[in-house]
Amino acid sequence: MAENRRNDREQSEFEERVVSINRVTKVVKGGRRLRFAALVVVGDRNGRVGFGTGKAQEVPEAIRKAIEAAKKNLITVPMVGTTLPHEALGVFGGGKILLKPAVEGAGVAAGGAVRAVLELAGVADVTSKSLGSNTPINVVRATVDGLNQLKRAEEVAALRGKSVSDFA
């Protein structure tokens, strides 16, 4: 009973979005084995976001596994108001994602998988450009890499042993 209540609370805390579902086959002696691979992004629209992949013989089971994996793989995104603190270039494999802060009210200028990650992270104003590979998993991983590179002015000042006013 307590386990069930915890799951209900967890479900309301995070929003999830299925980025892609891929049918994969394995050729065996007796023919082909079909399975489904799901890529899911979860976030609380308040600075926390994660992604996960799941594989199963049925689509709902693959999605459930991907959601579980995503909740174990959360990162915190530093934000300045509704946008990012500075530019970042995320790279994973052949995929590169350029993330740029935008003025308030500009919205999320991003496509597909990048939009899912940024919206669920709670970033409301950002411009992005996808370069290289457009495979959904590479794009999501590159976006998360770019978000991991972000630092607030206070963090940079502390690392350099200066005050924030020295940078202005």
Curated annotation (Swiss-Prot):
PROSITE patterns noted in UniProt: RIBOSOMAL_S5, S5_DSRBD
Keywords from the named record: Ribonucleoprotein, Ribosomal protein, RNA-binding, rRNA-binding
Domain S5 DRBM residues, every copy: 14-77
One Pfam family from the record: Ribosomal_S5_C
One Gene Ontology MF term: structural constituent of ribosome
UniProt GO BP: translation
GO CC entries: small ribosomal subunit
Alphabetized Gene3D superfamilies for the sequence: 3.30.160.20, 3.30.230.10
Functional summary from the UniProt entry: With S4 and S12 plays an important role in translational accuracy. Located at the back of the 30S subunit body where it stabilizes the conformation of the head with respect to the body.
Domains (record comment): The N-terminal domain interacts with the head of the 30S subunit; the C-terminal domain interacts with the body and contacts protein S4. The interaction surface between S4 and S5 is involved in control of translational fidelity.
Family from the record: Belongs to the universal ribosomal protein uS5 family.
Subunit details: Part of the 30S ribosomal subunit. Contacts proteins S4 and S8.
Protein name (database record): Small ribosomal subunit protein uS5
Gene: rpsE
